[in-house]
Structures are given as structure tokens and as C-alpha cells.
Amino acid sequence: MQLHSLIASTALLITSALAATSSSSSIPSSCTISSHATATAQSDLDKYSRCDTLVGNLTIGGGLKTGALANVKEINGSLTIFNATNLTSFAADSLESITDSLNLQSLTILTSASFGSLQSVDSIKLITLPAISSFTSNIKSANNIYISDTSLQSVDGFSALKKVNVFNVNNNKKLTSIKSPVETVSDSLQFSFNGNQTKITFDDLVWANNISLTDVHSVSFANLQKINSSLGFINNSISSLNFTKLNTIGQTFSIVSNDYLKNLSFSNLSTIGGALVVANNTGLQKIGGLDNLTTIGGTLEVVGNFTSLNLDSLKSVKGGADVESKSSNFSCNALKALQKKGGIKGESFVCKNGASSTSVKLSSTSKSQSSQTTAKVSKSSSKAEEKKFTSGDIKAAASASSVSSSGASSSSSKSSKGNAAIMAPIGQTTPLVGLLTAIIMSIM
């Protein structure tokens, strides 16, 4: 019986090996692309019309005016169309799979690219396509997508895509809308410097590692529940942010320089693993919509001309706090009460409004005596200036303040230690402001 089993197993291995050899050898040599081959005319592409599968990296360039790759269903390698400055259109509508990357780059008069059957590709790069108006595909699987410096008005070629590693869309000045059914983003979702009326819709997205939005007009993330790393909104024309299902942000949460922003709605958000930064949003008079936020793992930094800050459920800030309003109507009472109870655990606590300031230096002894503090409080009647975070000021402040944050799994952040005597008069930049640099640099 054992002998029969051994013979059967050996026969199966031999059959599998022969099948693999047969499969490999079934691809004719004419369908194998040499390492330095470049197609510069349609006749070069026609040579592959009898191939179901191409093996190698296909590069297209030169003086080709219109191009078509007919009948090929699979490329075991990459497809690159580069610097074909006379090319106006390209089609490969039989192509279903590219094991490596699809690259369309520096095609100055290309108006359309059609890959109607393409379902699987490792990465897509559409870069410097100033005349393109349409890109067609049926992508269901892609790890990385980069779309930069094109004239696309909408991104419609990814309507079947459910998961992605990187989705980066930047510097597409005519872009007005992006709507995607993506459900998970394992690395980063980034939109920046596109058309100033761009609308972003990712209503099926449930989880993302990192999201960064810059120069966006409106956003919709109806089902987003968790951000493993950071979430940032920098310099947008958004009027409201509604993320009612979001409950956890693993690291930094930044809302900076959104002049038209008036409303926040993060009613289910309970934990921020890193810092919370809300700064220089000139239209945001009342900062609310954070009703269930209980824990901030880093520092709390809020700067602007707001009249109220509602953080009623907040129990713990593991870093320091720097809250400064230009409005004389803003009250520091709630934050001072939280600090006195030991809820703000960092070395510094600064709260200012247009009429007064409260600054506290915590003694080193306090950290070893169950959060008992020795505090020196100074008050001033001079008017507070709204901080303007220029790159020069931020970098200078950053050298005086450092913030460490653990990985996405632990999601913790500690405030800077060292010479942190925060007894700054109103209008003087405190070292904690340096935190904003690290935040902006980390998400851009």
C-alpha cells in the first residue's frame, strides 16, 4: 500500500512539472520581449497580435501617432508608454492583466487611453498627460495608483476597485470629482493641489492607514470607521467635515488653515492616539462635534479666533496643551479644571484668549508624586495674537520641541521633555508650537 502511494505521489509530481514546462514552453519566442526592445511604430505592435500572453516589459515611444495593442490578454511584466510626443490615442482593450506596472508618462498630446478589459495590475502611473480627457479601465485589483499632472476632469477608471495600497492624486488642475468604491486603503490616500472645486467621495471606505487632503472643496466618507495612522485636512475650501462613524484615529488628527470651514461632526470619535491640532481655520467660530472624545494620546493644540471649544467628554491628554484664541469671549475654565484634575499630563499647559492667559510649568517632582503639581500661574491683560505658522517659525520652534509617536498598533505619543518652562507672555511663540511642523511634514 505504501509503495502504491509513493508511486502515485511521484507520478503526480512528474505530471505537475511537465504541465508547468509545457505552459512555459507554450509561449512562442515571438511573444517574448527582449530587455531593450522599444516599439516606435504600429507595425512593431502588430507583431504581437497573435500573442495571448507577452513575457517581458513592453515599452512604447518614438513617433507613434495612434497606437493599439490587439488581442493580447496578459503581460507578464510591465507596459510603459513614455515620451511619445506625437501619440494622440492608445487602446489595449483585450488586455486583462499586467503583472507589474502600467505607466503612461510625458505624453504631451495624448487625449485618450482605453484599457476596457483591464482588471488586474500591480500599479498604475498616469504622470504628465496635459491633454488627456479620458482613461478607461475595469480595474478590480491594483496595489498602487498615482495620477499626477493630467487634464482629467474625473477619475472614472477605477469603479470596480475595492482595495488599494496607495491612492495618490495630485496636481490635476481640471479635476472636479473623484468617486470610488474602495473599501480599504492599507497605506495612504492622498489628494492634493487638484482643481479648487474637487469633490471627493469614498462612501464605501471603512478603514484606511493614512488620509491627507489638501485643496479639496468637499468630501464624503460616510462609512469610514478607523484611521490607523493620521488624518489631515490642510488648506481646503471645505465648509463642513462629517465623519459620524469614525471612532478611532491611531496617530495625529490635524485640521489646519481651512478658511471656509464652519462645522465639524465627529460625534463617534472617542480616541486619538497622537496629537489633536486645530489651527487657523478662520471661519470656525465654534469648535464642536467632538462630543465623545475621551482620550488624546499626544498634545492638544488649538489656535484661532474661536469663541468656544467643546471637549466635554475629554478625560485624558497624555501630552501638553496649547490653546489660544484671539476672541476675548473664549473661556479657559474647562481646560483649567481638566488640568487641575491631572487630565493634562504633559509638562506644559497654556491657555490664552484675547484678554488673558494662563501658563503653567509643572515641576519634575510632580511626575513622581501621583500627578501632584507645583504650578506657577501668570495672568496678563494684553491682547493675544493669532499665531501664523510660517515655515521659518515652525522649523525654529520644532528644534525646541520634539514629539515621539509609536507605530500604528500602539498609537501613543508623548510630549517633549527637557527645558520646557512655559511662562510665555501673550503673543510669544511657545516650544509646543513646534509640534505643528512635525504634523504637517508627516502627512504631506
From Swiss-Prot:
Instruction: Specify the glycosylation sites in chain numbering.
Output: 57, 76, 83, 86, 196, 210, 228, 235, 242, 263, 268, 280, 292, 305, 329
Q: Where is the composition biased (Low complexity)?
A: 359-381, 395-418
Q: What is this protein called?
A: Cell wall mannoprotein PST1
Q: How is it used?
A: Mannoprotein called haze protective factor from wine that is able to prevent visible wine protein haze formation. This mannoprotein showed haze-protective activity against wine proteins and BSA when either was heated in white wine.
Cell compartment(s), UniProt: Cell membrane; Secreted, Cell wall
Species name: Saccharomyces cerevisiae (strain ATCC 204508 / S288c)
The entry assigns this protein to a family as follows: Belongs to the SPS2 family.
Q: Where is the signal peptide?
A: 1-19
Tell me more from the record. Present with 11700 molecules/cell in log phase SD medium.
Propeptide residue intervals: 420-444
Stated induction or repression of this protein's expression: Positively regulated by cell integrity signaling through MPK1 in response to cell wall perturbation. Induction is dependent on transcription factor RLM1.
Q: Which GO terms describe its cellular component?
A: cell periphery; extracellular region; fungal-type cell wall; fungal-type vacuole; plasma membrane; side of membrane
Q: What PANTHER family does the entry give?
A: RECEPTOR PROTEIN-TYROSINE KINASE (PTHR31018:SF3), SPORULATION-SPECIFIC PROTEIN-RELATED (PTHR31018)
Q: What top-level branch of life does the organism fall under?
A: Eukaryota
Instruction: State its role.
Output: Has a partially redundant function to ECM33 in cell wall integrity. May be involved in a repair mechanism activated in response to cell wall damage.
